Regions:
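Conserved Class I S-adenosyl-L-methionine
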Residues: 46, 167-264
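A structural alpha-helix within SAM-dependent methyltransferase catalytic domains
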Residues: 26, 49-52, 116-120, 147
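A short acidic, Gly/Pro-enriched loop at the edge of an enzyme's catalytic core
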Residues: 89-100
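Class I SAM-dependent methyltransferase SAM/SAH-binding core
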Residues: 38-40, 44-91
Length: 264
């Protein structure tokens, strides 16, 4: 997996909709208050703090592959809250967590078969996963714009061996993955969370963090701003609505699964 470095503070300012989805996801879980919780791709740590508040007699650990994200997250202090710089693909926990949570992060992980195996291993008996991430059809406008842009003559040479940064599966595709792991029960839902950004500035903040990050990494410094401006111009032109808002398709996949009980 290729890792990318994000600006934690800029992401915090641009991730209003991700936080809304995350709080909705947290509200779905019935906490006892003493769980050990792992947050995969914790980002700026705001949602991990909400998890910590939900388990006053438990613990919440947030992990992220971005140093800057973890630095931002570590400005949040709770006695039962910890953040660690760790690539999700390299986690090696065993029988440690009652809940593995993730919001708006796991579409950055390419190998979900291994992710599911590692997560199953990390859960205690009867432990649960609760994930929400980009699914099939997510960010359709941006993906169309960026795919055309990186194939243009001025930029194509920098993307010859480029590894696409996201994995956004359909419900059927993910059902095939999870059914092979051994969870005692699981539910997969596809969700339409299409969004109208209130103005151009709001959409641009989202384009900058996180959408453009993996593509700007490929381009020489002297071309980065030109590339950025061209993408932004095309996105605003393509997505502007008559009322001055800007539309993007957000299609989510939500995963709930429970590990089997211990066999005696």
């Amino acid at each position: 997996m290729v890792t990318f470095e994000f600006d934690g503070e800029k992401y915090k300012a641009a991730s209003k909709h991700q936080k809304e989805w995350g709080n909705d996801l947290i509200s779905e879980f019935s906490f006892k208050g003493n769980e050990a919780v792992l947050d995969l791709g914790c980002g700026d740590g705001v949602l991990t703090e909400q998890l910590a508040l939900s388990v006053p007699r438990g613990t919440a650990l947030g992990i992220d592959s971005s140093v800057h994200m973890i630095e931002t997250a570590k400005t949040i202090h709770r006695n039962n809250l910890k953040f660690t710089h760790l690539d999700i693909n390299k986690m090696n926990f065993e029988n440690e967590f009652d809940l593995i949570f993730s919001n708006a992060a796991l579409h950055w992980v390419k190998d979900h078969k291994q992710l599911l195996k590692n997560s199953y291993k990390a859960l205690k008996a009867c432990g649960k996963i609760l994930w929400d991430f980009g699914g099939f059809g997510n960010c359709a406008n941006f993906i169309d714009v960026i795919q055309k842009k990186i194939s243009e003559h001025n930029y194509a040479q920098y993307f010859k061996a480029y590894e696409w940064p996201w994995f956004m599966p359909s419900k059927k595709q993910y059902m095939d993955f999870i059914s092979a792991i051994g969870f005692s029960s699981y539910t997969i839902k596809e969700r339409n969370k299409d969004r109208y950004f209130s103005n151009a500035s709001e959409m641009i903040r989202w384009i900058d963090q996180p959408c453009l990050v993996p593509f700007l990494k490929q381009i020489p410094q002297e071309l980065k701003e030109t590339f950025r401006q061209e993408v932004i111009t095309e996105m605003l032109k393509r997505t502007q609505q008559p009322d001055g808002t800007y539309f993007e398709a957000f299609r989510r996949i939500r995963i709930y699964a429970q590990k089997q009980e211990e066999t005696r």
